């Protein structure tokens, strides 16, 4: 018998996570399995001080002008180009985060400088400035001052993470072996170990500061770790699981 070889389908390059999610949204209308911005959730929720809708055409520029700088992040979902009346090129980029979507305008040299970042599917970190060009004018200008990829800045933006933990939460409860005394109470004996394991598995460039809060004295013991970490969703979620814990993120270096 002559064996006839069956045609094999051509090998195709595997889609990236973003491409898969975009196809998912095209078919269903929403992201189902994940969101393309999930890797940058810590930045969007703790570093950014604005959403795309906050800087749109109906933005309250008086309020925005009170901020030293406006920081927002999101994924590019649309790009269109054109020309100003003076003949200079311009671009309009639609940025979307978890909460809103807005088209941002880039004019003249600003568009020429950052147009390479305006690719549908790209995740961007955008810095803007709102100011009066002339003291005698009521018009407040809103301009883009910097555009970077979120993937390039997510490990650089957060300079330090401070975790404040009640001292009682790090102590094993008395009589932990007595079921009657500890019924309904959480066993805290492994909290420090679990936290240490989580932090150790997330090496990076961010300074880590631990504050132990003593409820009796009202004082905090502050320790600066020799190790540096990457602040990710798992760490933030672990902190949020403990209702008495607090955390703060700094974008400037601090001294312990």
Which residues does each PLM region occupy?
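Noncatalytic, beta-rich nucleic-acid-contacting surfaces in large DNA/RNA-processing enzymes
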Residues: 1-256
């Amino acid at each position: 018998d002559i064996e006839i070889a069956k045609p094999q389908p051509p090998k195709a390059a595997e889609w990236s996570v973003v491409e898969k999610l975009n196809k998912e949204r095209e078919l269903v209308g929403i992201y189902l399995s994940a969101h393309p911005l999930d890797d940058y959730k810590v930045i969007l929720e703790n570093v950014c001080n604005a959403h795309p809708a906050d800087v749109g055409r109906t933005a309250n520029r008086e309020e925005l002008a009170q901020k030293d700088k406006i920081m927002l992040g999101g994924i590019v979902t649309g790009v269109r180009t054109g020309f100003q009346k003076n003949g200079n090129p311009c671009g309009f980029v639609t940025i979307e985060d978890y909460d809103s979507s807005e088209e941002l305008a880039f004019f003249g040299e600003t568009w020429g400088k950052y147009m390479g970042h305006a690719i549908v599917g790209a995740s961007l970190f955008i810095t803007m400035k709102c100011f009066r060009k002339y003291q005698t004018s009521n018009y407040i200008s809103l301009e883009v001052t910097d555009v970077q990829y979120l993937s390039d800045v997510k490990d650089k933006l957060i300079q330090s993470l401070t975790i404040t933990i009640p001292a009682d939460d790090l102590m094993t409860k008395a009589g932990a072996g007595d079921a009657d005394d500890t019924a309904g109470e959480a066993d805290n004996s492994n909290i420090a170990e679990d936290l240490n394991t989580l932090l150790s598995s997330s090496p990076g460039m961010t300074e880590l500061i631990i504050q132990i809060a003593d409820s009796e004295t009202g004082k905090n013991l502050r320790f600066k770790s020799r190790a540096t970490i990457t602040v990710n969703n798992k760490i933030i979620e672990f902190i949020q699981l403990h209702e008495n814990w607090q955390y703060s993120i700094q974008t400037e270096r601090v001294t312990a």
